Curated annotation (Swiss-Prot):
Gene this chain is encoded by: Tmc8
Organism listed in the record: Mus musculus
Tissue expression summary: Expressed in thymus, lung, prostate, placenta, testis and spleen. Expressed in lymphocytes and peripheral lymphocytes.
Residues bearing glycans: N184, N375, N571
Keywords: Endoplasmic reticulum, Glycoprotein, Golgi apparatus, Membrane, Nucleus, Phosphoprotein, Transmembrane, Transmembrane helix
Species lineage: Eukaryota, Metazoa, Chordata, Craniata, Vertebrata
Superkingdom of the source species: Eukaryota
Bias (Low complexity) ranges: 689-712
Pfam families referenced in this protein's UniProt entry, alphabetically: TMC (PF07810)
Topology relative to the membrane: Multi-pass membrane protein
Compositionally biased intervals (Pro residues): 678-687
Record's protein name: Transmembrane channel-like protein 8
Length: 722
């Protein structure tokens, strides 16, 4: 390894065998550095050592080839250009500075919520871009025919319910905007899309409208899986019992490039949060190991009691949503119409507001670690939210599509044509009201609850106001809100193609509202958790919401009769029927035969066998990789033990090789570091070997400390130093 030799006095006497062993180690290290293709700038050495390594790789007097001289400046230019692109991308990244500030002040756990919100915004923008490119722009370019008169259907309906056209309308513009009736004849809803008959030469708007939601859901599915897979390799390699040493955090956490006081303050908070999380995790592990059998039995009973109570709360909430939706759709009297319009969204929002609060209190009784507590709260909140949305969809299906009910209008037209002549618009309006109501609640709680609470706590003093304090920023509740809004957006892709645009605007505003609430109106949670322990669950919850949205959409596209009065699929028994028609019109006969074969049982059975084989191979490879990872862990432990043995041998060897106390090579003049060639904490830097007279570097250029100068210690820079 690199050794520092004095150029002012000769070396101390050494034993021949030890000198030969050290020279052999030195020659091996030099050969390794010369043969390595690692760039010099990436090596963990001081600048003087890097210059020496460059001289070893490119000695003077040796001529390089023309290709090397031509390729080197271009390689350096490409590297500089790549770094400039990365800096530019970080500079123009969405909310990079805000995310850095939030992560430093409140920890990576709360920062993960805002990062997740940004990911949802990008998903919505991608969905909107695909819809605009494949549906809206071709529709405007092709100029579909004008809307003709509505079909006059003679419906056999009872006299009690009012048809949709006779439902009282309120001409207040604000109310029409909130309910979505102001946009019934716009491209926001399904009913405004029209197209002529299909032909073999024109672009099919119907096929694009049908496939764009499916493609968007598929792309969102791939993006969520990619984000979920990013954290898996680290968890697999490190394992669940891995803990970063506190010494590594203490000596390597500070960024010495910081020259601004605000950035230094944020960095101090970030390091403090990391150390607090490490100490709290260690304390919880010690307490869990010291529990007796009686304490474990009491804890198990607490788990059972809490989970039974949570299940009862979920069942009651689902029942309330079902009956609220059913009552709202079955009663459309003029006196109650204004209230019943927002009865289902109101009940769902009330459940989603009270549910996380109760779940947080109940799960805290179980005394879980902060990361596990957040994940369990999130799981129960998601079960509540997805079950609520599922029950809401089922109730709408019962009312609109007569699922599980027998009605005369449903037998004739496939849906409840008496009450809903354009049922796609009605479903779209319900989903639109859910999105609007969710955002209005976010604004109301931020400025009508959190802000007055903070002002009252700061204005008055007393035990009550001390107990009340500022609002705690609950990550599970906030994640639940944006996941619910995103699930509703995915459910409405077929009924409201422009709903992702509306949700993108709401997510953009939600980021700044939540940031203001966090920085001004909220207090930091005393139970800190890591982002890596919850980010995976955030995306898992989002994936469950995607599956919940995909199941009703697949049923509607494949098996539900379209409205006779509006939309693109008025003449089709189901929207999917346009696909066989276009296949027969636009594809040649061999392609049609190939598609028939791909959709037949003769192809499905071999495909199933092939997928089974591939799945078996993947599982076998995964198990082999797990065994290899275990072997690498053991090998790493063995290497660490071997290093410690070498350190012990070196500590026994140093007294034998130490010169006289007055010599400049005495042990007192050297720093006590067992990291030769590597920048250890507290050491002045790597040590460089003695060079030939032509390539010799002075000891002053290596930055070798004198005996009177103590080794530098780690400290935070003061404000005057910055």
């Amino acid at each position: 390894m690199f050794r520092q030799w004095s150029v002012q006095s000769g070396p101390a006497p050494r034993r021949p065998e030890s000198q030969a062993a050290s020279e052999e180690l030195w020659e091996q290290e030099v050969e390794r550095l010369c043969a390595s293709r690692t760039p010099v700038r990436m090596l963990p050495y001081a600048m003087a050592d890097k210059r020496f390594i460059r001289e070893l790789r490119e000695p003077e007097g040796v001529k390089t080839t023309f290709w090397q001289r031509w390729h080197r400046p271009r390689r350096v230019a490409r590297q500089h250009l790549r770094e400039a692109e990365q800096r530019l991308a970080r500079g123009f990244g969405l909310w990079e500075g805000a995310l850095y500030e939030i992560g430093g002040l409140f920890g990576t756990g709360i920062q993960s919520y805002f990062t997740f919100l940004r990911f949802l915004l990008l998903l919505n923008l991608l969905t909107m871009l695909l819809t605009a490119c494949f549906v809206l722009l071709p529709l405007v370019w092709l100029r579909p025919p004008e809307l003709g008169p509505a079909l006059k259907l003679r419906l056999q309906c009872s006299s009690s319910p009012l048809p949709q056209s006779d439902i009282p309308r309120f001409h207040n513009p604000l109310w029409n905007i909130l309910t979505g009736r102001a946009f019934n004849n716009t491209y926001l809803f399904y009913g405004a899309y029209r197209a002529g008959p299909e032909s073999s030469s024109e672009y099919s708007i119907r096929l694009a409208y049908l496939l764009s939601p499916m493609v968007c859901l598929l792309l969102c599915f791939c993006g969520i899986l990619q984000r979920m897979a990013e954290g898996l390799p680290q968890q697999t390699l490190l394992g669940q019992r891995y803990r970063t040493p506190l010494s590594a955090k203490v000596f390597s956490s500070w960024d010495f490039c910081i020259r601004v006081w605000e950035a230094a303050t944020i960095k101090k908070h970030e390091i403090s949060n990391e150390l607090k999380m490490e100490l709290e995790e260690g304390r919880r592990v010690e307490l869990a190991q010291q529990q007796t059998r009686a304490q474990k039995a009491c804890r198990l009973l607490t788990y059972l009691r809490t989970n039974i109570l949570i299940v009862l709360l979920v069942v009651g909430a689902i029942s309330a949503i079902f009956w609220a939706t059913k009552y709202s759709q079955d009663n459309k009297e003029e006196s109650l119409f204004l209230v019943l319009q927002y009865l289902p969204p109101g009940v769902i929002s009330l459940v989603n507001f009270l549910g996380p609060q109760l779940f947080t209190v109940l799960i805290q009784l179980e005394n879980y670690p902060p990361g596990t507590e957040v994940n369990l709260t999130l799981i129960w909140c998601v079960v509540l939210k997805l079950a609520s949305l599922g029950m809401f969809s089922f109730s709408l299906g019962q009312t609109v599509l007569c699922i599980g009910r027998n009605k005369t209008s449903c037998e004739s037209y496939g849906y409840n044509a008496c009450d809903y002549q354009c049922w796609e618009n009605s479903v779209g309006e319900e989903l639109y009201k859910l999105i609007i109501f969710n955002f209005l609640l976010t604004v109301a709680f931020a400025f009508l609850v959190s802000l007055p609470r903070r002002l009252l706590v700061e204005r008055f003093s007393g035990w009550f106001w001390t107990w009340l304090d500022r609002e705690e920023f609950l990550v599970p509740k906030n994640v639940l809100d944006i996941v619910a809004a995103q699930t509703v957006t995915w459910m409405g892709l077929f009924y409201c193609p422009l709903l992702p645009l509306l949700n993108s605007v709401f997510l953009f505003l939600t980021f700044y509202i939540k940031k203001y609430t966090l920085l001004r109106n909220s207090r930091a949670s005393p139970r800190r958790f890591r982002a890596s322990s919850s980010t995976f669950f955030f995306h898992l919850v989002l994936l469950l919401g995607l599956l919940l949205a995909a199941v009703p959409l697949a049923y509607v596209i494949s098996s539900t009769h379209s409205s006779w009065d509006c939309g693109l699929f008025t003449n089709y028994s189901a929207p999917w029927q346009v696909v066989p028609e276009l296949v027969a019109l636009q594809l040649p006969l061999p392609s049609q035969r190939a598609l028939r074969y791909l959709s037949s049982h003769a192809f499905s059975f071999p495909l199933l066998i092939l997928l089974s084989i591939v799945l078996t191979v993947c599982i076998s490879q995964s198990r082999a990789n797990a065994r290899a990872i275990q072997g690498l862990r053991k090998q790493l432990v063995w290497q660490v033990q071997e290093k410690w043995h070498l350190v012990d041998d070196l500590s026994r060897l140093l007294p034998e090789l130490s010169p006289e106390p007055g010599s400049p090579h005495s042990r007192a003049s050297r720093p006590r570091s067992f990291c030769p060639g590597f920048p250890c904490p507290g050491s002045p830097g790597p040590r460089t070997p003695r060079l030939a007279p032509s390539n010799r570097l002075s000891s002053s250029s290596l930055g070798a400390p004198s005996a009177s100068v103590p080794a530098s210690r780690f400290h935070f820079p003061s404000r005057t130093e910055l």
